[in-house]
């Protein structure tokens, strides 16, 4: 069953709707950015599962880009924009555990050189103090016609989310 880019984005947003704050076509964004979904999770920090000793904060910033053809130039521009926006949102305080920047590219066509770039792209940042956490980049690019599906090492979970949500 083949779906359009718009249908795929709607189904992905439906997946993220419950625990995330979702927005379609953010006003200040690039034309390729179709939707965003942000989650901030606060949970208890415990010792031996008994004594509460503080809290732990984690974030997931999801950016869904819709492009006709994913070229290396578009890929670089969108990844830079997503990371820049996510870093404005991260608060690396002593309770911050980790943040994930998850970037979906929903495409009609993925250029072969872009497939290699997606698979090789790695980004990890540790904050100055170990207790202030870290940030990782997860990437996935999918041709909606059933063709290419690729991800970086951290982004394979995004392909599973796409598979469960869209197909």
Per-region residue spans from a language model:
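A broadly used, surface-exposed interaction patch
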Residues: 59-89
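N-terminal, charge-rich interaction modules
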Residues: 1-67
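Short, flexible, solvent-exposed loop/turn segments with mixed acidic/basic and small polar residues
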Residues: 52-55, 90-95
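Nucleic-acid nuclease catalytic cores
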Residues: 93-117, 143
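Switch/connector loops and helix/strand junctions flanking conserved nucleotide-binding motifs
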Residues: 73, 111-116, 150-151
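Short, surface-exposed beta-edge/turn micro-motifs
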Residues: 58-61, 98-101, 137
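"Short basic amphipathic alpha-helical interaction patches in structured regions
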Residues: 76-81, 115-122
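Charged, structured surface patches that assemble and position nucleic-acid processing machinery
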Residues: 120-167
